Amino acid sequence: VTTYSPNPTVEFDGGLTFADNTISSISIRAGRNDVLEQPQPSYARIELWTDASEPLAVNLSDAVTVSIDKGTSGQEQIFSGIISDVEISLDGYGDIGSIARYTLTAVGALAQLNKRLVGASGFSKEFDGTRVFNILAEAFLTSWLDVNPTLTWQQLPTQTTWATYDATNEALVNALSTTVDVPGEYELTAYSGGETNAYELVQQAAQSGRGVLWEGGDGHLHYDDYSARLDNTPLTLTDDDILARGLRTTAQWSEIVNDVTVTYKANASKTARDEQSVILYGQLAGTRSTQLEQATAAQDQANAFLTSRSYPRTYPETIIIPLHSPTVSDATRDALTAVYNGLPVVTNDLPAVFGTSFSGYVEGWTWNLTRYTADLALTCSAFYETYPHLVWFQIPATTTWAGYTPNTNTWEDL
């Protein structure tokens, strides 16, 4: 039995810091809801209390970070972004004192990417990781060609430097060499569609490479190529960690796809179809658009999409861990305060209605914090949705072990 309080800390530009009873509540959402999508921009909703006679020196676009205590020692940064909304209300006002509530919304780096343009000079044929790197570098670095030729330093605020001009994030760009998997796994066709939204173009590249572009709690952007998750160390969760109340699973007809089309270079396409699934559920078609260069890669992705979606999914949609619970270990708290997209999660302690065991990957997460409590809700996908394997309905009824290919397969392979 261990005791724990998250003791969240909120820090703004210039070192302005809030902690303890000045924090009402904090909620943070990051990642994605489905393995077939790309993550949306992360956001934080921060509620602070202060004296109404002392306005806070916070402004739109100011940087903000949120950190919480780890299980063992020290703090972990779980969010970094810029302020997008400021709302002020009064909880109390009178002769004996006043309380103002600041409700701040902050957004992560992907939201900033959505306000950038790239691609005016096009991109050569290259692999997915290289394309992602090039798009991000172009989006976040301001070059001389981006500057109005008539602009002079005298026309800018006195505190402006080249490093801060246009909110350029040099630290983020410098980190790309270690946070982006280069070159990637899939070759993409050349891009010559002209200047366009950076967020949309980089998501297309990531989706085409079956990778994922996500935001870390430290504010850096990460791109994991398709094979990256195989190297991650699994976290085992027990019934001491998981909040059983509220577990839910929903088998949805709308998620089933048994007739797949994948488009690639020059609007060519490849298809895949699962006849057993069609017999069971009817024809349920789905299309995935890519920037792939090679026909073999398009067929590979069509087959994988079909395998992962031709039958319903039956595992918990969300797993909630109350880090403040005395049954959660400090080691587990340390691992979860550093949660990331692609963290492998394993448990054998689910109620029987959920199949008892689950192995998969964290796709998204939501923090709900007060001074004393920390609930972390994990949105997960099953292992087979990233690295598909066969289910019984996909094996012909006439198949025998003696005739199965490859003959090195074992029961655990299916």
Language model regions located:
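Beta-strand-rich assembly/attachment modules of structural machines
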Residues: 1-126, 373, 381
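Charged- and aromatic-enriched interaction segments used to assemble
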Residues: 75, 92-252
